[in-house]
Design a protein with these regions (language model features):
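Residue-identity detector for glycine
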Residues: 3-5, 30-32, 44
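Bacterial lipoprotein signal-peptidase II cleavage site
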Residues: 24-35
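N-terminal ligand-binding lobe of clamshell/alpha-beta domains
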Residues: 25-26, 58-438
Length: 438
């Protein structure tokens, strides 16, 4: 029989085992295993914003999926502050009189030097269904337009090719005139009776026709004072979107104005693709022309009543000649406007010019040129038959597609010019706008 000491030792061992078992069974998880933390990811996650909460309610968040493309029709249904509603943006590279900046739900379009008064305009294009900003500081006096617009009257044919090529002629409800249009898809709309003619703002304006078109915007341009020319639209409460494309002095600068109407319909992606292709082809042609062995001399225009309007060396026409690998004889005339010289002065400087381009409206033959002034026949280019006019595509109303499609597609004009000045570089060229006078 065990003694008292043995009994005490046995009780101590049992107590120790009980304490050890209790210690091993005590766990905060109850099962002895930790729950792993949920992984987090920021890749491709939607925009989240915190919903308003009070001190007595639990905080909640609402997941908002930001748009990945611009809304080209309709309005935002549920506006959320902080969401970028213009994920597809554009930049202006070549046009000096057009600019655009973006905020989350509106864009600011600025037009400068729109006429001889150097008129400037600011447009705040607000995504429909979102709040307009306060027009303070540099936005004071801006014209606010909800975009995308669904209807417009276009009072400049230079905008038509771009709208046609991005497939958005659906917004065009009227033109100032049907007479001078060349774009085939627009001619189809005219033939179908789908458009109204409003007359120009400065001559023959038809207020009833303009009102009947119910345009969100009227795209136009200015020659005279802005206050006078835009008054008819202001009287109808129709916003005027003023283009300054014809004030640009480079071919690509003018062509890039196709982006102007596209900004009003949120078609940044489509018009950027179109313009980038044009600019790339134009650049390739400039490089091609630069490989020519010689740079022929070029004369422009003609005399009227013994006076020759000589284009400046910084003009649109002069830039075309330079890019085509030619030397414009009057490149030393400063600026982009013309200088008036008498025909004898021009003869003295340019009688031996290699080529004579753009003698102008109403000159269909060498005979017409000589009839306008017999001294025209004294130029060597006339004697050789190296006189070319840009009137190959003129309609029955004397609308010249050179000023429509040619403005939107300067690469086509440049291709013609290279084929004239450097035929060895384009032996199989088919002319689009130019023809040799006979």
């Amino acid at each position: 029989m065990p003694g008292p000491g043995s009994t005490l030792r046995l009780l101590a061992a049992v107590l120790a085992l009980a304490l050890l078992a209790a210690a091993c069974g005590d766990s905060s998880g109850g099962a002895g295993t930790a729950t792993p933390a949920s992984p987090s990811s920021t890749s491709g996650s939607p925009t989240t914003v915190a919903a308003p909460s009070s001190s007595t309610e639990p905080s909640t968040t609402t997941t908002v999926v930001a748009p990945t493309v611009n809304l080209t029709e309709g309005c935002v249904e549920n506006y959320t502050e902080g969401v970028d509603y213009f994920p597809q943006k554009l930049t202006v590279e070549d046009a000096e009189r057009l600019g655009v900046t973006y905020e989350d739900n509106y864009k600011v379009v600025r037009v400068s030097d729109a006429n001889f008064e150097e008129a400037a305009f600011t447009y705040v294009l607000v995504q429909c269904g979102t709040p307009a900003p306060e027009l303070t500081d540099d936005l004071a006096g801006a014209t606010v337009v909800e975009v995308p617009i669904s209807s417009a009257v276009v009072m400049s044919t230079t905008m038509l090719p771009g709208l046609a090529e991005i497939g958005r002629l659906d917004i065009v409800k009227g033109l100032d005139s049907f007479d001078y249009v060349s774009t085939p898809a627009v001619l189809d709309l005219i033939e179908a009776g789908d458009l109204v003619a409003t007359g120009s703002l400065s001559f023959g304006f038809d207020a009833e026709a303009m009102a009947a078109a119910e345009p969100d915007v009227a795209f136009t341009f200015l020659f005279g004072p802005a206050a006078d020319e835009l008054a008819p639209l202001e009287g109808l409460g129709i916003p005027a979107a003023v283009s300054a494309d014809y004030r640009e002095n480079t071919p690509l600068g003018r062509a890039e104005w196709m982006k102007f109407p596209a900004l009003f319909i949120n078609e940044e992606a489509a018009v950027t693709d179109l313009y980038d292709g044009i600019a790339t082809e134009y650049g390739d042609l400039v490089e091609k022309a630069a490989t020519a062995a010689e740079r022929p001399t070029v004369l422009l225009d003609k005399a009227t009543d013994g006076v020759w309007n000589v284009a400046g060396g910084g003009s649109y026409a002069a830039r075309f000649i330079a890019d085509a690998g030619g030397d414009y004889i009057f490149s030393d005339v400063e600026g982009n406007s013309s200088e008036q010289l008498d025909i004898e002065t021009v003869l003295e400087r340019a009688s031996d010019a290699d080529f004579w381009l753009n003698p102008g409206f109403g000159v269909s033959s060498l005979m017409d040129l000589e009839a306008a002034d017999p001294r025209h026949a004294k130029f060597a280019a006339f004697e050789r038959g190296d006189v070319w006019n840009n009137d190959l595509r003129v309609n029955a109303n004397f609308g010249n597609d050179y000023f429509e499609t040619g403005a939107a597609h300067p690469e086509l004009v440049l291709g013609d010019l290279i084929a004239i000045l450097h035929p060895e570089l384009a032996p199989d060229h088919e002319f689009v706008f130019y023809r040799r006078l006979q």
